[in-house]
Amino acid sequence: MAPFEIGLVMPIAQFGPERTTPRWPVIREIALRAEAMGFDTLWTPDELLWRAEDGPPQGVWDGVSMAGAVAATTSRVKVGTWVLSALHRNPGIIAKTAETLDEISGGRFVFGLGAGHEWPGQARAFGLPEDRIFARFEEALRIIVPLIRTGHADFEGQYHAARDLPQQPVGPRPNAIPLLIGGNGLKGQRHAALHADIWSGYAEERAHVDELGPRLATLDAICDEVGRDPATIGRGAGISVNPLQPAGWRPTAISGPAEEIADTLRSFREAGFTQVDLMLGPGTLEAVEALAPVLELVRAD
């Protein structure tokens, strides 16, 4: 059985009614403490701006910059993008970014990648494309994957191009940076089956294995369809967690005593997931510390 990994999505967005902004000294302290606690991967989300219907905009620090800073601050834990949006950047530059982050981390980088999205208004606010998102992603993959797997890309598409483009310089793992493709839909799973080391979904409505578990059978079927052994792809689940709130606080987040949170993580492992990545609320050191007994319980099994 593959090892079961637990990751932490770093709190780099404004949070709470007062839109509290986590500052770098706090983010750095959280990263170091999470590494010491034994988290397997620290992820930085790649969002730009959230516009809530009932409140002011919610800002987010740049995820790539934060990934580099976290990688330079830590020494053992893996560091990844969760997930880097192909909608925000040129695909050749995305591949170079991944190579650079692997260099900064000394070979600890996990390249989380996704199609991106237009909601809730961030694409429009930044003047980014709002249409044909998956068509754009398919073209981006025809540049990114060859660059990180063979060191070269040559492609001319409707939305993207790479003309005799070499992947230079290269970091400590030429052609071998692990690729995670995120997305709940069939298209995301198919791209993962074709190109990625790991597929990851995320629980939107309920922080429960019943929401994401059925997608594993779909992933297996897609792997069979494209001629891939389903056992060769990792399976991730992103779930929200608030260890400072009582059990049953919200259906979209796991909460309550450490044993109850640990039981939820175990249920994902038993369903066949190889990793869970925890989206922490609130983004404080106190909340991270409250997860220490959860990790101990799951690791003790």
Question: Could you tell me what each predicted segment is?
Answer:
Residues 5-22, 84-154, 202-211:
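Flexible, glycine-rich active-site loops centered on histidine and acidic residues
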Residues 25-28, 32, 68, 99, ...:
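Alpha-helical segments flanking ligand/cofactor-binding loops in enzyme cores
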Residues 10-25, 82-92, 174-184, 245-259:
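Active-site mouth loops of central-metabolism enzymes
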Residues 1-2, 10, 35, 126, ...:
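An alpha-helical appendage that flanks or caps ligand/catalytic pockets
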Residues 34, 38, 46, 70, ...:
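Conserved, mostly hydrophobic/aromatic
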Residues 6-10, 42-44, 78-81, 109-113, ...:
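Hydrophobic faces of well-ordered beta-strands that scaffold small-molecule active sites
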Residues 36-39, 106, 196, 270-273:
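A structural motif
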Residues 1-73, 177, 279-289, 294-297, ...:
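N-terminal beta1-alpha1-beta2 module of alpha/beta enzyme domains
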